[in-house]
Amino acid sequence: MRTITLEEHFASPEFFDGPARFVKERAEKVGGRYAQVMDRLCDLGAKRLGEMDAAGIDMQVLSLSAPGVEQMEPADAIAMARDTNDYLADAVKKHPTRFAGLAAVPTGAPNQAVEELERRVRHEGFKGLVINGHNRGRYLDDRF
């Protein structure tokens, strides 16, 4: 029986210059665990695969770490979603039996979110998407 873990997180180096810059700033000040977290989230290669093997994990279904792209202005979120999805798609192509992807989409730009999801699912084999429960401070179930 295969062991598949769901919604395992990843990040790209660019993600730590954008929505997760607070983690990078903290890592630069104190190092330690913050630097380790950044390194581990960005690793979609030998180190992660080794940890998966050691834990008996055959496959990870990966999604972008919090805070996602939902806190960004729509134009920035569109670019960050594409970049982080490209980063994930590259890892899935290199290790298709070990990684599967869930897309990040710019929910503040609905048309582009649909385009990004279609591109990732139809053309790159992503399994779906992850939508965080809020967009720039507004929860999905807030009254409009």
Which role does the model predict for each range below?
Residues 1-144:
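Helix-coil boundary/capping segments in enzymes
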